[in-house]
Amino acid sequence: TPSMFKRYSGTVLNLAQGASGNNYFHFFFDIIPKIYLIKKKTRIKIDFYYVSTPKKWQIKIFKILGVLEDELINSSKNKHIFADQIISLDHPWYQKGMFQDQVRKMPKWVILINRKLFLKKKSKFKCFKKIFLDRSSSSYNHCQIFDQKKINKWIIKKDLTIYKPEKLSFNKQIHLFNTASVIVGAHGAAFTNIIFCKPG
């Protein structure tokens, strides 16, 4: 019904994409490239951004990109909207088929723009170069390590230092991965940060 619609004056960029919109990996590889393309490759002025329920860490990163919190439209609270113009972009790299196959074909420009946008924002702190990524605080149960005591012995033997990336600010995560020489851990979204590692 018309009463369900919320009206916005101006142009809205649609960045909603279901549950993956709040996933750390998909945020950097799906959503950030769309914002970059609109801001840097067009003259379109975006007034609002239609997004999946924004998390605190996302709001901070949006701010780095020049997107203010009051410019974000929460798609969970506003399922139907009207605007003068609504823009939706194709996925920047996924075409069709299995995700695992498509991610292997990730365009280099997607990685490079993330490095260009965020490497300069790193916050230096004293950290070790050989690191182990601990997923024990993850809200997801997959890729968890069950024999942690045995793994801890191995970690000590290999002179690795344990880090929980989600306990660090985004800026410190950039620095941690940028200075790392060895990174070990179970598969998880934190490995997205390898885009900030030094080449080689």
Where are the regions a protein language model picked out?
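The feature primarily captures lumenal catalytic ectodomains
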Residues: 1-200
